[in-house]
């Protein structure tokens, strides 16, 4: 039976005698059992009846990263290509095998999940930690998970597949768990005061620790029949602490977490909070990129080793996010991390971050507000010049998606400081004509020697979205939305050469920058060119629809607002 599903709608299936409610809010999901849905092709392709174990094995502990679907597909394709090479009677090139495997990824995943779930069942059982504890592993889509924990080795199992995790009589005060959205990947037992320092072999997973005031004697294991999904302390006298379910990207992390909306230290955590980090002021850092919705920050990345692969992950997680890049000069480092708290467009509460450096650079990772919204900043952290690890919540683990929780060593009360004058905009007239968020960046035109343009070729009109400018003294500035995965060649600019900014409008009349050159391009007759001299200030006002530039000098002010469709 086919249904035309709409959100917040309930459909009655008279054949199965069930109601399908499509709200999917947390309240509705908690009130009743969720109904599993399958692709129609996968359901028709099934070899066996859908079992509870199969549904449980495919259930997610928490929402997976946006990029995980692609990574899982690539893993399955590589595994399947190797199997095809071994099974086929003819020898085919690796490229051909990968192409064939790419057409069978979904079918391979469906059949493998069915076969692995045969003969298994969802179960809960107790493990005595005062006795020997054995661990067994399984492979799911090329990823290793913990299959079972127990006090004995099953007689029919090969003992070489089981490992002794803990010996009888060894006290257990803390349990380290590495997991991803599909299950538990590693378990470590240790004493209450022990840390799990150093590198671990578990990548792309989240670490959390279960601890108790006294030694843990018994635990309850929850399994989906294929792999472990949760571990609980088997003692009703010990409260279930919400911090036991905070996942960290590394087992070595600070313990104090603050809420940047209230500056209160967090003791009761949101369900399945995930914390990741970036290295501030570490050796080799050349700048920072933040993704923002305007009223809040969603993600912060520290640039090192010229890696651009993270952009694909950011695009998948935040398809409508705005990218703000803050470059660093030689010898420059962040001296203050501050919070800007204000009312954003539409009266939304805005809690953005501001980075201030030792060379006077001030960068607001968020939308610019009117002057009355910029009274003071709250300094949250003074990073060490030789490096500080700053932890923030993965925005997909909270609602709304934004950075709300921070963690770092040596927490201190926030300190108010004056708002940097460079971050207080002089709003143009279009500021008051709509409520969409505007992102402002500016630069001095004197002394520029190089510029690198950033063009978004994924859009039909291929706009210039940002510029990285380099000065004769080594200083660097960014205008607009600059990304290193969309850059064009660096252009040398002579000291006396004016810049020409060519603008156009889309079919919806949205203004954008089509080109930036040292002379107007005559073969682009439809462009509206704006001449910018090598003195004065150039501002770039960006929204999710428009790119407006404004040039101010002693002789007056120019904008590209007069550009026609």
What positions do the PLM features span?
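Lectin-type carbohydrate-recognition ectodomains
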Residues: 1-565
């Amino acid at each position: 039976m086919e249904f035309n599903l709409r959100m917040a709608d309930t459909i009655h299936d008279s054949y199965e005698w069930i109601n399908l409610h499509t709200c999917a809010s947390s309240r509705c999901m908690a009130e009743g059992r969720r109904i599993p849905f399958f692709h129609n092709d996968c359901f028709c392709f099934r070899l066996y009846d859908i079992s509870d174990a199969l549904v449980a094995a495919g259930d997610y502990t928490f929402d997976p990263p946006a990029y995980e679907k692609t990574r899982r597909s690539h893993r399955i394709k590589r595994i399947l290509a190797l199997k095809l090479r071994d099974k086929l009677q003819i020898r085919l090139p690796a490229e051909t095998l990968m192409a064939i495997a790419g057409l069978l990824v979904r079918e391979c995943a469906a059949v493998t999940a069915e076969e692995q779930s045969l003969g298994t069942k969802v179960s809960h059982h107790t493990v005595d930690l005062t006795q020997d504890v054995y661990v067994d592993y399984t492979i799911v889509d090329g990823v290793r998970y913990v299959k079972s924990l127990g006090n004995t080795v099953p007689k029919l199992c090969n003992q070489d597949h089981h490992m002794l995790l803990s010996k009888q009589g060894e006290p257990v005060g803390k349990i380290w768990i590495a997991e991803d959205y599909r299950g538990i990947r590693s378990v470590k037992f240790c004493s209450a005061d022990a840390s799990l320092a150093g590198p671990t072999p578990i990548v792309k997973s989240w670490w959390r620790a279960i601890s108790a005031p006294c030694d843990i004697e018994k635990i309850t294991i929850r399994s989906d029949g294929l792999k472990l999904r949760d571990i609980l302390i088997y003692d009703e006298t010990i409260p279930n602490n919400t911090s036991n379910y905070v996942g960290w990207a590394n087992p070595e992390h600070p313990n104090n977490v603050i809420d940047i909306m209230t500056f209160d230290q967090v003791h009761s955590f949101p369900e399945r909070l995930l914390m990741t980090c970036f290295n501030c002021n570490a050796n080799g850092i050349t700048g920072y990129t933040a993704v923002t919705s305007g009223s809040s920050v969603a993600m912060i990345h520290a640039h090192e080793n010229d890696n651009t692969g993270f952009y694909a992950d950011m695009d998948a997680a935040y398809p409508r996010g705005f990218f703000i890049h803050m470059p660093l000069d030689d010898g420059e480092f962040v001296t203050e991390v501050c919070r800007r708290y204000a009312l954003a467009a539409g009266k939304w509460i805005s809690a953005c971050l501001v980075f201030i450096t030792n060379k006077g650079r001030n960068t607001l990772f968020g939308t610019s507000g009117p002057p009355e919204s910029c009274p003071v900043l709250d300094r949250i952290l003074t990073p060490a010049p030789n490096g500080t690890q700053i932890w923030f919540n993965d925005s997909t683990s909270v609602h709304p998606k934004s950075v709300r929780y921070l963690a770092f060593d040596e927490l201190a009360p926030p300190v108010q400081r004056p708002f940097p004058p460079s971050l207080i905009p002089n709003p143009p007239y279009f500021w008051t004509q709509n409520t969409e968020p505007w992102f402002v960046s500016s630069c001095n035109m004197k002394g520029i020697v190089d510029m690198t343009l950033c063009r978004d070729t994924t859009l039909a009109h291929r706009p210039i979205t940002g510029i990285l400018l380099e000065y004769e003294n080594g200083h660097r500035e960014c205008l607009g939305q600059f990304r290193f995965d969309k850059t064009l060649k660096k252009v040398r600019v002579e000291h006396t050469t004016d810049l020409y900014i060519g603008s156009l409008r889309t079919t919806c009349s949205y203004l954008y920058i089509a080109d930036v050159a040292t002379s107007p391009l005559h073969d682009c007759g439809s462009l509206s060119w704006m001449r910018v001299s090598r003195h004065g200030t150039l501002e770039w006002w960006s929204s999710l629809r428009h790119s407006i530039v404004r040039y101010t000098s002693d002789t007056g002010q120019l904008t590209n607002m007069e550009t026609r469709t």
